[in-house]
């Protein structure tokens, strides 16, 4: 029988614990034990069940002060374990979905099945206080033996996601270390699970906000992150459909979406540009989105034709050549009080496409809310055509209407790695600490000829989001993320 208690005292190879029933017990000490820690143990771990256990109770009762101290430690740990004692969350998705609550030593504090298959999977298992890598490995092997992973299924995919506990009051540097450690933990889990025959593992690092939103919709955080990725591609999957889809089906659907985008023919001009400075009506590559719950509506699939001048000729500046707006000389980060940003980006388009995809997501890594009217983001590239011959479109902005996002092209003279950049600014929006915002957009030449992006400074030909320092972010004209090109 698995039991829980708080360590009151450590004596050599023994530890004194106070159980939730108010009983003091002496148990075998483990190497990782420390005073005040909540631990799980079995009856066979208890020393002299019929003797010393009750003697220790009698001794403890004689010291009221000691009892009060221990009770304080116990209730502090019991009631605050959901905040300071919890380091993060690891979710295993196959079709059974199970969330594991872990402490800073990567021990499992709690096991939370997230669907009926998950309840069946963990039934009868003793998983508390075990290393999370061992637990994940055990769950996946059990999924195979239970038939959740079919022997004849060529798509044996396991999704493992992780998120930190945002309730932990820590310095920014410690938070960044935690993020790096979480990534390393997911990599270690993946490396171990990859040893299981024919199992393919995909890992996702989620934000605490994404995890909370996932819980609202009754999804695991990993599945919800796949849903968000689908929304950015074309929005053809709904929340209700996600509930009924397996992880393998979802990932296969995402791959089909990506291939469809790559296979799309280059957009054709509907009319030719006129001489009076008027801009032609064109059909850019479709990037449709259905409504994300809690977010503003995005263009429907019926909107086949988009005018590049949708936002007031944003891509046609007033002057023929513009200098960068208040550039910063430093290529290092400038800390602006407790404000910080991080950009994650990858291109969904091939290097020789007719449009450059600058869609990204941006995190508030600081301790203060950020007014996005003070923020600028830059995407750097090389191109011989004039900035007057390019235009842009924003299809989705998670913190408001796409019309609240403005873009402008700038020449970047004297640089080897880039000669132009697109600057993205915001008319509205507030990004709270630990929150994330999404932008979907692209820019293109007015004649819709193809770009060659392989030598573009900001181009990232990856297949999923990653921290991307070749896009820069500024708060009040101070560089807070990324490295400017040389």
From Swiss-Prot:
Tagged with keyword Cell membrane: yes
Q: Where is the composition biased (Polar residues)?
A: 268-291, 322-333
Task: Tell me where in this chain the RsgI N-terminal anti-sigma domain is found.
Answer: 3-50
What SMART domains is this protein classified in?
CBM_3
- Gene Ontology terms describing biological process: carbohydrate metabolic process
One Pfam annotation, family name? RsgI_N
Question: Keywords in UniProt for this one?
Answer: Calcium, Cell membrane, Coiled coil, Membrane, Metal-binding, Transmembrane, Transmembrane helix
GO CC aspect terms: plasma membrane
Top-level taxon of origin? Bacteria
The compartments listed are: Cell membrane
- Coiled-coil parts of chain: 161-192
Q: Indicate yes or no for the key word Hydrolase.
A: no
Which ranges does the record list as Cytoplasmic topological domains? 1-53
Give the InterPro entries listed for this entry: Anti-sigma_RsgI_N (IPR024449), CBM2/CBM3_carb-bd_dom_sf (IPR008965), CBM3 (IPR001956), CBM3_sf (IPR036966), RsgI_M (IPR055431)
Q: Which residue spans traverse the membrane? A: 54-74
Topological domains (Extracellular): residue ranges?
A: 75-486
Function, as annotated: Anti-sigma factor for SigI1. Negatively regulates SigI1 activity through direct interaction. Binding of the polysaccharide substrate to the extracellular C-terminal sensing domain of RsgI1 may induce a conformational change in its N-terminal cytoplasmic region, leading to the release and activation of SigI1.
What does the annotation say about its assembly with partners? Interacts (via RsgI N-terminal anti-sigma domain) with SigI1.
Q: What is this protein called?
A: Anti-sigma-I factor RsgI1
Gene responsible for this protein: rsgI1
């Amino acid at each position: 029988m698995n039991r829980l208690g708080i360590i009151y005292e450590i004596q050599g190879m023994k530890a004194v614990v106070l159980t939730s029933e108010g009983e003091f017990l002496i148990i075998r000490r483990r190497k990782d034990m420390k005073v005040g820690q909540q631990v799980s143990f079995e009856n066979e771990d208890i020393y002299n069940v019929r003797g010393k256990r009750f003697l220790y109770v009698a001794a403890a009762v004689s010291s009221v002060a000691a009892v009060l101290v221990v009770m304080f430690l116990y209730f502090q740990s019991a009631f605050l374990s959901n905040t300071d004692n919890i380091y993060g969350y690891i979710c295993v998705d196959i079709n059974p979905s199970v969330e594991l609550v872990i402490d800073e030593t990567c021990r499992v504090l709690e096991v939370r099945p997230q669907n009926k298959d998950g309840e069946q999977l963990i039934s009868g298992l003793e998983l508390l206080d075990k290393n999370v890598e061992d637990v994940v490995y055990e769950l996946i092997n059990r999924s195979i033996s239970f038939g959740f992973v079919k022997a004849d299924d060529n798509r044996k995919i396991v999704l493992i996601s992780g998120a930190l506990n945002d309730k932990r009051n820590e310095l920014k540097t410690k938070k960044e270390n935690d993020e790096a450690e979480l990534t390393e933990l997911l990599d270690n889990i993946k490396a171990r699970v990859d040893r299981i025959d024919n199992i393919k593992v995909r890992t996702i690092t989620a934000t605490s906000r994404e995890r909370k939103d996932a819980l609202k919709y009754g999804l695991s955080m990993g599945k919800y992150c796949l849903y968000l990725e689908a929304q950015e591609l074309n929005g053809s999957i709904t929340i209700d459909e996600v509930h009924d889809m397996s992880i393998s089906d979802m990932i296969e659907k995402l791959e089909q979406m990506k291939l469809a985008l790559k296979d799309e023919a280059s957009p054709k001009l509907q009319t030719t540009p006129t001489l009076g400075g008027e801009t032609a009506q064109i059909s850019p590559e479709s990037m449709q989105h259905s409504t994300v719950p809690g977010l503003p509506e995005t263009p429907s699939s019926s909107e086949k034709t988009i005018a590049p001048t949708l936002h007031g000729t944003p891509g046609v500046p007033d002057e023929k050549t513009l200098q960068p707006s208040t550039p910063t000389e430093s290529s290092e980060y400038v800390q602006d009080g407790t404000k910080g940003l991080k950009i994650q980006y990858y291109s969904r388009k091939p290097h020789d496409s007719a449009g450059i995809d600058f869609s990204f997501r941006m995190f508030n890594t600081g301790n203060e809310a950020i007014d996005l009217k003070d923020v600028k983001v830059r995407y750097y590239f090389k191109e011989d055509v004039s900035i007057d011959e390019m235009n842009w479109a924003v299809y989705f902005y998670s913190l408001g209407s796409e019309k609240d996002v403005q873009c402008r092209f700038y020449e970047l003279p004297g640089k080897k790695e880039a000669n132009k950049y697109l600057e993205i600014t915001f008319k509205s929006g507030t990004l709270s600490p630990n929150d994330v915002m999404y932008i979907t957009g692209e820019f293109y030449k007015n004649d819709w000829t193809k770009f060659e992006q392989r030598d573009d400074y900001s181009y990232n030909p990856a297949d999923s989001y990653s921290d991307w320092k070749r896009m820069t972010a500024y708060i009040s004209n101070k560089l807070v993320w990324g490295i400017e090109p040389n």
